[in-house]
Amino acid sequence: MKKLFFLCLGLTATAATTAPVEGWLHMRGPLQTGVSLEKRLQDKIQIEDALWTVDLPGRSTPTVANGRIFIVGHLGEGADLQEGVFCLDADTGEKLWEHKFNDFLSDIIYTRYASSSPTIDPETGNLFYQGTQGLFASFTPDGKMLWQHSLMEALGRMTFPNGRTATPVVDRDLVITRGIMANWGSQGPPWDRFYGFDKKTGELVWAAKPGGRPKDSCFSSPALGWLDGKRVFYATTGDGSVVCANARTGEAIWQVPLFKAGINASV
């Protein structure tokens, strides 16, 4: 049975062109730390109090910037299945733009695990999206595509049923994502790999495999932090480890094996 995701928000919005970029910019919040900066929030939210609702199937976390809401969802079934990025007006729920892409993997089941969520760059307001079909792309706040990569074709990203895709993170000039990859040459054999792309051009800056050979899928999202004055990210991996890696190079700083199977929970 198809389940619907009901997006219900009551927000006071500012114009989409307002600078600086402010809002809930990442799945883990405005600073990508899992901490909200908001004060005096309501203890309870009732569906009856919603200013508007939008029916959109999906398991993405909405992100918000300058009066606009960005979310990933899916439409259609079977051969007509599409995944898309949608932009809504935060005041009214009106759809401002959308980009839909064919999800040619017929075994995707969106109602089980989490899918990737949009990430917003705090500097430019641009949006980053990794799709279940292997697309990794950047859009302006107005919906213009800036660059795109087919990670399956370019890097051999493997896919798994149920959506299993990580949410990208932004560190200054880089946007970082990950996946289980299997390819030729330097990108083979199958491994849990992380990639740093230039956020403005989409150029690949570094590729790294800070964990061991994967025993299972892993779609946790990296968490940024600082260690001894260096920008790092913490992540779980497909070999059952927790790793700390240099966010500027992807090089592992430490690795702690914990389990005999992949860990899908984010740090």
Placement of each model-derived feature along the sequence:
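Noncatalytic, solvent-exposed loop/strand surfaces
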Residues: A16-V267
